[in-house]
Amino acid sequence: MCGINGIISKDKNKDKLIKSMNEKILHRGPDAEGIFVEGDVALGQRRLSIIDLAGGNQPIYNEDKSILIMYNGEVYNYKELKEELTEYKFETESDTEVVLHGYEKWGHDLPKKLRGMFAYAIYDKNKGEIFISRDQFGIKPLYYYHDGDTILFGSEIKSFLAYPKFKKVLNKELLGAYLTFSFTPTDETFFKGVYRLPSGHSMTIDVKKRKIKIDRYFKVEFGNTDKSFDEVVEEIGTAMKDSTEHHLISDVEVGSFLSSGVDSSYLVSLAKPDKTYTIGFDLAKYSEIDYAKDLTDKLNIKNISEKISKEEYMNALSEVYYHMDEPTADGCAIAVYFLSRLASKDVKVVLSGEGADEFFGGYNSYDDNFYTKLPFFIRKSMASICKILPKNKITRYIIRRGLPLEESYVSINRTYYDDELKDVLKIDNYIKNKDIVKDVYDEYKDYNKLDKMLAVDIRYWLSNNILTIVDKMTMAHSIESRVPFTDMKVFDVARMLPKNYKVSDGTTKVALRNAARKVIPNDAWKKKKLGFPVPIREWIREDDFYKEIKNTFNTDISKELFNNDYLIKILDEHKNR
């Protein structure tokens, strides 16, 4: 895994600029640096050596040096693809060169052939264009900025700060979306003028005209298998075994994150890495160390654990937000930060369980309870009555469940509804939440309720939050994360499952749990979801954490954007609860 940068500009100091951009992402690749400067184009790369340690430095050129690549990621089917590229001469054993020659053969159809995680830039001098692609689910990040004369792109926004004309302007219109989703769900970022290339998309830059064209090459599709439950369970097991084996391809040691849940326990039971890593906290219900140790003892592998204190957590916040580039309200970001720090002492590569919930139905919200099973016209009528009653937890729930799905469900982690944001924000020109997800709901209008929810969460929650966190936090410590659940062959199985194979009678990931049950030697296959639990709710009630948050609310920028009295009221209510 690595980090890439690029600048297309008339600026005469591009060689220094690209060097400075690379320095901003040194943590993504401390092993080697690659730079290319010619004409209006400057490309950079920082390398973390994982495959072909000696021969994989970049840029890598084709045979006549008319095409070159800067690449971040791992393509796990590169050996199979290489067999289809026998007409080309290979100078290395790296997957990077396979991607380069794959472009020569398949052109812009290349990303459709790739199985893995990637964000690469291929400069085709013959066409005068740079072809950039991001993997199907957004495992690897890619951002870009275009001010008319200059185009910047890179793995992290912070590299753009090296460009003197880049202005750091807060994109206030995203505040409403952030408060609702707890992350930035849009292609726009909190830096005005900076965008993320969406997952499953490619971007073509016309170097001379400074034009950008974005195309989608992958769409999430759902079906409905007619296979029996036992057949599906067997199919999941086969796909996961194959994916795990491919994700273990490496010239360096591979470890694994491990919690007490089914996803990471399944991965560890399949991969059996020499070392696994777990963090916990002093409060027993927030520590998964004992569960992890039980599993690794049964598998006869090593578990390395660490307990994180409240003070360590607080002290890490600024470092975490620096590496995230944008704000996140997801406490697991800090948990993954400490996990990555722990693992980085031993290994360069770790397996992690992201993607299982979004593919196989891992959230309770996906299942209907007694109330949501009522006909919509009844729920809508009940909501109308509750609107004139005093507001409390019950009436708010009934009102929300009286909305159509397109308005009631925008994210698995929804915090605010549009009509509640006016109490929090002083600005009123924020993007409405239902407008953010409208395109997805329009595109999937003919699918069932669960598939619509999965499509929303794969597009936003998985790509822009979960996978972004695991990439940024592992890269902060110069290690590579690999996510075997978020794999095209695994998804091809998951996308065909009917609802009752995913969620049923309060049980999530029904079929996946049954596949995991066959290889996990303890009862982790049936444990309820915890994620990476962090005791933030308890800590906020303690004076030091409470005062830190209250002081933040009282800053000038906070007073400019938020209704501080309302925020402090919520904070005090939580502290005194």
Describe these PLM feature segments.
Residues E91, D215, I304-E306:
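General small-molecule cofactor/ligand-binding pocket signal
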Residues T86, E104-H108, P521:
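Glycine-centered helix-coil hinge/cap
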Residues Y88-S94, D109, K168-K172, E231, ...:
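Structural motif
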